[in-house]
């Protein structure tokens, strides 16, 4: 048994213990046929990212589950890895080049990709090392990357497989375009933000001169692409003009008026301008009515096909067009109008709906199975309320745009023949056209959406499409831990991808957590200046303190507020456990964890309490109630074990009865070992360090069996009996504190009770913990002599001679002095309140405050008078 240092140094311990775990190969998952597998794949962080509090929260939850299952005898695989993060990484590297006075086009595609790989190799390991600092027990030997050969093979197989089934197609549709990132985005990558704007009401003259239409728009610049006006066929106001044409203001183009049920009669004027290339609904109407399509924005959101406005930025063009409309008499009125504007989830610039030829995943056939596995309970969401969120999205899902106009990512495996125009889609890099065998072919320049490869993560990381031993043993995985903000981005796509490619759901449980927010409830971010660096928190307080802080008080699906002060409190908790462990070790003469044959009342009490705790914590962990489990362990260690049982054991440890001493030692060690095991998944470093220092049955705590409820250690009667003794101790302590009696001043305690056997057994503990000179247990009907202080619990009357507690004359003088002061204060307040001028003229809040002070003074006087009466 080694000695623990006087002061706990988390930094020294964490480095040493993590290396011990690595050297022992404890994180490695074996395919053991005699064990049940338990698998979690880590949500892959961006390859060039660094750890933020969201990661720390997400990874701590996963590590707790993995450590719990590992200790519970499962063959646990926590598979780590990182994402190539197409847009994010390309932007980072382009910023670097910009600082060097270069662009990616200066380098060319291959040269730029060399730069990105160099960037990845330089910064890619940073977040891995930070995850290790946090204590993550991942199987680092199985680490994956979404662009490695294994994942790339899975991406190719999936793309070609789905293309051959008609589930992936290339088509001309309205997509979301980010002019800043210069790429298409999927619907899930668009964040809608309410922004103040205007509603411009514009005259569209009828071509035959018989009148005009008034049309309202929030985007006058898109008028340049108008190719029609639509009204509702049931709208009586416009039935006579359907089939006519009107003149497009400023442009002079004649455009048809069509009837379509898409138009809402009660919105605006009931007339809607049709811009098929820049609105998804207009596009659908145009398809039904054969309207012309005119694209008026280029990839940088500058005007094209717009006459004199060509080359203008979209917002510059808006201003110019509004001025021209007003000057030429087309502008009727302008109203303030707030509306939702689509923005890029990555750069937060406004996105443009644009007609474009892109690659899409046909979602309707895939959604059916993805809906079924959730509705049938094969995949469960925790909390259950997120099932509705998922299903609502899946029932209304649109085809997924998967092509991105980037260079970094999985390039689309399609080659175009320059001779015959045929497109070849292939699992291997094509060298010739499959139709005419010409070698004059060129690969599609676009790459796949990052989320396409991420959607395959649960099975591509295990070797799919090859039939590997890992895939056979560890798949499907068990739990996916993620935030509610990426249910659409990632969770839904993993489910339908897995169902399609492996014919199995990728996991059985989706554990949804909330976001980490600042103390005011605001979302944390660098730009807002309220972000907290988890590595800085680890440097200040230790990884265990950070982990325990972000877990305690948290519940699945709910946001949590982060307070730095709580990290300090959790460090203090670690210190309390450390000091308690040192105390046990300094008093330990046994070298095994066996319980004594004879258990005294406090022993049965603490063992029964611990036994209940073990059962409850298991139940909480199995229900993913990690915050509740952590709080229960905290309360038991701080209150039950440290503040009560250690103090109760001191009498036997310092006594002359060798058997009683050994019994206390064994129970202290047994419970300490148990709480180290219960706490280990939450605070792995300090628990492993202490475990290695005390007598232990396993080579490492990380693989020690997790405590279970044991019927043999359930002592409900003794537990209840000892709670009566504890109630008495608390009551005596409270009364002594009220009377300002120092602990050093002893006084006899008489216990009048019907539970005589219980209190006779508990008398030594009352004497030690309630500063009693002696304890006498008498019948419940005992009549107290004059001059006794009486405290009552629901099972006993506790009597103490007043004279033994305090100097009666000095206390009487002190109380009289305070009473005189309180009466003078009350007299002044009542005089003030009797002044009609004060009551009628002073602000109501001031008068109420004065009345409140008067009531408090009355209560104080009553208490002081009661105390004086007790003194006699």
Regions found by a protein language model. Give the residues of each.
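N-terminal catalytic cores of NTP/NDP-binding nucleotidyl/phosphoryl-transfer enzymes
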Residues: 30-93, 146, 155, 215-217, ...
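Active-site-adjacent "gating/activation" loops or surface patches in catalytic cores
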Residues: 253-258, 445-475, 639, 643-646
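Non-catalytic terminal extensions that flank enzyme cores
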Residues: 1-53, 76, 332, 345, ...
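Extended active-site and interfacial segments that coordinate phosphate-rich ligands
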Residues: 56-64, 213-249, 272-279, 289-295, ...
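Secondary-structure transition/capping motifs at alpha-helix termini
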Residues: 67-75, 96-109, 129, 133-138, ...
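Feature 926 captures the class I aminoacyl-tRNA synthetase adenylation module centered on the KMSKS loop
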Residues: 201, 392-452, 456, 500-543, ...
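Residue patterns forming the tRNA-binding/recognition surfaces of aminoacyl-tRNA synthetases
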Residues: 2, 7, 16, 20-24, ...
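Short, solvent-exposed turn/loop segments enriched in Gly/Ser/Thr/Pro and often Arg
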Residues: 33-35, 43-44, 77-90, 143-151, ...
């Amino acid at each position: 048994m080694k000695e623990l240092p006087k002061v706990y140094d988390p930094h020294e311990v964490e480095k040493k213990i993590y290396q011990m775990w690595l050297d022992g190969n404890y994180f490695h998952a074996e395919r053991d046929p005699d064990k049940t597998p338990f698998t979690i794949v880590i949500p892959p962080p961006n390859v060039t990212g660094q750890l933020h509090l969201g990661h720390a929260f997400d990874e701590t939850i996963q590590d707790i589950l993995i450590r719990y299952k590992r200790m519970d005898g499962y063959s646990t695989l926590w598979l780590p890895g990182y994402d190539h993060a197409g847009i994010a990484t390309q932007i980072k590297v382009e910023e670097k080049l910009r600082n060097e006075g270069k662009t990616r086009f200066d380098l060319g595609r291959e040269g730029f990709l060399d730069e990105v790989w160099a960037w990845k190799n330089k910064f890619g390991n940073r977040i891995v090392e930070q995850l290790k600092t946090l204590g993550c027990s991942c199987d680092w030997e199985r680490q994956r990357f979404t662009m490695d050969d294994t994942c790339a093979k899975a991406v190719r197989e999936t793309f070609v497989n789905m293309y051959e089934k008609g589930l992936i197609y290339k088509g001309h549709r309205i997509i979301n375009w980010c002019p800043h990132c210069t790429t298409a985005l999927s619907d899930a990558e668009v964040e809608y933000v309410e922004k103040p704007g205007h509603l411009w009401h514009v005259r569209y003259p009828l071509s035959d001169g018989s009148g005009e239409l008034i049309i309202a728009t929030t985007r006058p610049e898109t008028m340049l692409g108008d190719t029609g006006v639509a009204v509702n066929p049931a709208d009586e106001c416009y039935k006579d003009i359907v089939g006519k044409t009107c003149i497009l203001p400023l442009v002079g183009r004649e455009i048809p008026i069509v009837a379509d049920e898409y138009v809402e009669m009660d919105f605006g004027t009931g007339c809607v301008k049709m811009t098929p290339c820049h609105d998804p609904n207009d596009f659908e109407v145009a398809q039904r009515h054969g309207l012309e399509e005119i694209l008026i924005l280029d990839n940088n959101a500058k005007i094209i096909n717009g006459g004199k406005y060509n080359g203008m930025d979209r917002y510059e063009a808006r201003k110019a067009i509004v001025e021209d409309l007003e000057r030429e008499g087309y502008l009727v009125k302008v109203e303030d109008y707030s509306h939702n504007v689509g923005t890029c989830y990555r750069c937060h610039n406004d996105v443009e709906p644009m007609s474009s030829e892109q690659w899409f995943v046909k979602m309707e056939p895939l959604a059916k199975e993805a809906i079924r596995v959730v509705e049938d309970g094969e995949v469960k969401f925790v909390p259950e309320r997120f099932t509705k969120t998922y299903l609502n999205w899946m029932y209304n899902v649109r085809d997924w745009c998967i092509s991105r106009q980037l260079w970094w990512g999985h390039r689309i495996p399609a080659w175009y023949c320059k001779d015959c125009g045929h497109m070849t889609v292939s699992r291997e890099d094509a060298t010739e056209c499959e139709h005419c065998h010409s070698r004059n072919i060129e690969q599609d320049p676009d790459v796949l959406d990052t989320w396409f490869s991420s959607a395959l993560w649960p099975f591509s990381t295990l070797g799919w499409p090859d039939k590997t031993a890992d895939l056979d043993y560890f798949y499907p995985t068990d739990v996916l831990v993620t935030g509610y903000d990426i249910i659409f981005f990632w969770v839904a796509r993993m489910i339908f991808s897995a169902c399609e490619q492996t014919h199995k759901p990728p996991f059985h449980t989706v554990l949804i957590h909330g976001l980490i927010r600042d103390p005011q409830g605001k979302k944390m971010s660098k730009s807002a200046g309220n972000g907290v660096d988890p590595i800085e928190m680890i440097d200040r307080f230790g990884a265990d303190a950070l982990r325990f802080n972000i877990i305690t008080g948290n519940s699945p699906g709910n946001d949590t507020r982060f307070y730095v002060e709580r990290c300090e409190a959790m460090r203090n908790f670690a210190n309390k456990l450390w000091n308690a462990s040192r105390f046990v070790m300094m008093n330990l003469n046994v070298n095994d964890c066996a319980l004594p044959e004879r258990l005294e009342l406090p022993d049965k009490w603490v063992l029964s309490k611990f036994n209940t705790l073990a059962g409850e914590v298991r139940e909480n962990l199995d229900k993913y109630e990690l915050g509740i489990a952590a709080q229960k362990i905290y309360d038991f260690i701080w209150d039950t074990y440290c503040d009560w049982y250690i103090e109760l054991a001191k009498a036997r440890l310092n006594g002359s009865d060798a058997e009683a001493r050994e019994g206390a030692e064994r129970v202290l060690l047994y419970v300490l070992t148990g709480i180290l095991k219960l706490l280990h998944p939450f605070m792995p470093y300090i628990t492993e360090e202490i475990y290695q220092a005390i007598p232990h049955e396993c080579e490492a705590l990380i693989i020690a069996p997790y405590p279970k409820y044991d019927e043999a250690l359930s002592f409900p009667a003794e537990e209840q009996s000892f709670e009566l003794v504890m109630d008495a101790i608390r009551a005596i302590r409270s009364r002594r504190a009220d009377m300002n009696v120092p602990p050093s001043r002893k006084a006899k305690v008489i216990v009048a009770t019907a539970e005589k056997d219980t209190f006779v057994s508990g008398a030594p503990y009352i004497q030690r913990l309630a500063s009693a000179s002696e304890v006498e247990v008498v019948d419940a009907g005992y009549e107290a002599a004059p001059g006794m202080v009486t405290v009552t619990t629901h099972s006993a009357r506790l009597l103490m001679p007043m004279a033994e507690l305090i100097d009666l004359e000095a206390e009487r003088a002190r109380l009289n002095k305070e009473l005189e002061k309180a009466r003078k204060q009350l007299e002044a307040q009542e005089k003030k309140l009797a002044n009609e001028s004060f009551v009628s003229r002073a602000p109501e809040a001031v008068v109420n405050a004065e009345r409140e002070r008067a009531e408090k003074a009355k209560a104080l006087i009553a208490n002081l008078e009661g105390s004086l009466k007790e003194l006699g």
